[in-house]
Amino acid sequence: MSLQATMTAMGQAARQGASALRVATPAQRTAALHAMAAAIRADAPAILAANAKDLEKAGAGGLTAPMVERLMLNPERLEDVAAGVEAVAAIPDPLGVETARWTRPNGLDIARVRTPIGVIAMIFESRPNVTADAAALCVRSGNAVILRGGSECIHSNLAIHAAIAKGLKAAGISSDAVQIVRTPDRDAVGAILGGLNRTIDLIIPRGGKSLVARVQAEARVAVLGHLEGLNHVFVHAAADPRKAVEIVLNAKMRRVSVCGSAETLLVDRAAAERLLPPIADALIKAGCELRGDGPSRAIEPTMKPAVEADWSTEYLAPVISVAVVDGVEGAAAHIAAYGSGHTDAIVTEDVAAAERFIALVDSAIVLVNASTQFADGGEFGFGAEIGIATDKLHARGPVGAEQLTTFKYVVRGTGQTRP
């Protein structure tokens, strides 16, 4: 069978799996999620052995350090994966929920009710945990999913998927609901972008800029984009110095390879000489390289000079760009020029300044006095996330189970006819 025929058959099977999930009860979907988590734990030795193969290949292939860090699984991380599936099981089932209801003068009762999207294709790179997160969120929201991970993590993904399939079978749910592309052939991506003979309803890319750009340019079905995290922390003149140090240090250094990591520090010119030195000192002691503009280097001469490309670079490494700006307006202008619309934060004790920042910064997530590393579906109470959507339609910010639904209008009458 040709690759195109194989992929088309996968799409048709996914459509059948979506139909089965749509009519499954919330209790059945919850049971499936618990069974999936149990199977991941039971298969931990096989999954970690598969991950070791991917890591060995990554080392020989010269994969970048941030990519390797994202790829790596250990017992603790794998337990987090299983716990994440259980967290999705614990969130309220989004299907069948009435989001609005009203009665017309003619007596028609109209309700807007959440329903699954249908079949979702997930194209992602480096992160084997996405296999479990995407599967869990799609099962919770009643969607079938076709997973296509990167070749760098194919062994890990296949092992996790095998565990998920066991869990689904144990719960009486068809394995057609969660399928994985087993070949690293890039033509498989092209087939998915073509919609697999109109069986795919939504494509979600999660990876580097080039992957997302290709999907958005070539897809013949709807795309929910997850762009890079060019995130900023703006330290306002009215910031508490202690909070500023702690928030910036956490935003940058807690885990540098995640999309919620801060890549640029903006400091208010009105207080830069007071606020910047302790922040810079803390970052340097933590092993972070600072690349600053002229005004910031005048305050902290140890910084390397920033070049134009730095302001639009997602480092995913212990590196941060630093710029001095003129208040909230200057910070917002810098973010508008270089940001990705992902996550941006302000540190300030001035409520009016915070509200002005919120109004001016048009990002999916805007934080006040909190680290950008909270840009995560689990931290939002979504159980897990399938990505951070930076577009404005259909969802925005962390994409959890609720964001993977659409709606239908249910109209109940008593025999009305239209005059």
Curated annotation (Swiss-Prot):
The entry's keywords: Amino-acid biosynthesis, Cytoplasm, NADP, Oxidoreductase, Proline biosynthesis
UniProt-listed SUPFAM superfamilies: ALDH-like
Subcellular location: Cytoplasm
Pfam family, one: Aldedh
GO annotation, biological process: L-proline biosynthetic process
Pathway(s): Amino-acid biosynthesis; L-proline biosynthesis; L-glutamate 5-semialdehyde from L-glutamate: step 2/2
Location, primary (coarse class): cytoplasm
Domain of life: Bacteria
Record InterPro entries: Ald_DH/histidinol_DH (IPR016161), Ald_DH_C (IPR016163), Ald_DH_N (IPR016162), Aldehyde_DH_dom (IPR015590), G-glutamylP_reductase_CS (IPR020593), Glu-5-SA_DH (IPR012134), GPR_dom (IPR000965)
GO cellular component: cytoplasm
Any GO molecular function: glutamate-5-semialdehyde dehydrogenase activity
Annotated CDD domains: ALDH_F18-19_ProA-GPR
Record field: catalytic activity: L-glutamate 5-semialdehyde + phosphate + NADP(+) = L-glutamyl 5-phosphate + NADPH + H(+)
Its EC number(s): 1.2.1.41
Family according to the record: Belongs to the gamma-glutamyl phosphate reductase family.
Stated role: Catalyzes the NADPH-dependent reduction of L-glutamate 5-phosphate into L-glutamate 5-semialdehyde and phosphate. The product spontaneously undergoes cyclization to form 1-pyrroline-5-carboxylate.
UniProt name for this protein: Gamma-glutamyl phosphate reductase
